[in-house]
Amino acid sequence: MADSRDALLAFIVLGAGAVGTVVGGFWLAVYWMRSLGKKVGYSLAPLGFSRPRGGFLAGIGAGMSVGVGAVLLGMIVNPMSILVLERLGYSTESTIQQPFMEGLVGWVQESPGVAVPAIILVVVLFGPAVEELVFRGAIFNGLYRLGALVSTRSFGKDHGRSSTKTIFIASALASSVMFALLHLEPVLLPVLLILAITLCALFQRTGSLLPPFVAHATFNSVAAVLIILSGLKVLNIPI
């Protein structure tokens, strides 16, 4: 229980550091470019802090749809992952996520007034916000822009739609593999990889971090609700 609380606190500290690194690094790059005479501003819009194409409601709706779809996909893919791993002789025991979730359930049982809002704030809101900024706003976005720059310098502005697709696929795969591996759960690896690639596409299509954040928060909210309801003994289900 204490370990889970410590893990939440550590994630907040690391997340805040990651946000500071991304934003600070971006502003430092802007400052350097301005010193070279480039006309660039300090707006965080290039990182995805902007209005989604199609508007806020459309972006939120798209994000919720992707999040719900990911939850349903997980219900199908995760059992298949377990079956494949067991057939290959690998352990499917969760050594990180399940003990963490069980600790949070115990915390809810002990101090629901503190635990419930903390879980919602960190698992549903803060965590997805940090991860979307880092993996979609910074890593995927940075790789895609770098690939587009190299392609333009090499082949000119008319490098073609196929080249753009190749750059997207490479950037999405690289950032999504890092995202999936970060969670250290072999059973969840396929669904997390699919989710991450979809979030890259959602970010690319809308030009905003809001839709992928909503999708990520929707996906995480299912686990948060199960933890809270189990801790409050409303549901008696294995975590």
Sequence positions of predicted segments:
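Alpha-helical transmembrane segments in multi-pass membrane proteins
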Residues: 1-49, 92-101
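Alpha-helical transmembrane segments of polytopic integral membrane proteins
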Residues: 25-33, 74, 78, 127, ...
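Structural signal for membrane-spanning alpha-helices in multi-pass inner-membrane proteins
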Residues: 25-34, 70, 74, 123, ...
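Membrane-interface extramembranous regions at the lipid-water interface
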Residues: 33-41, 51-55, 141, 204-206
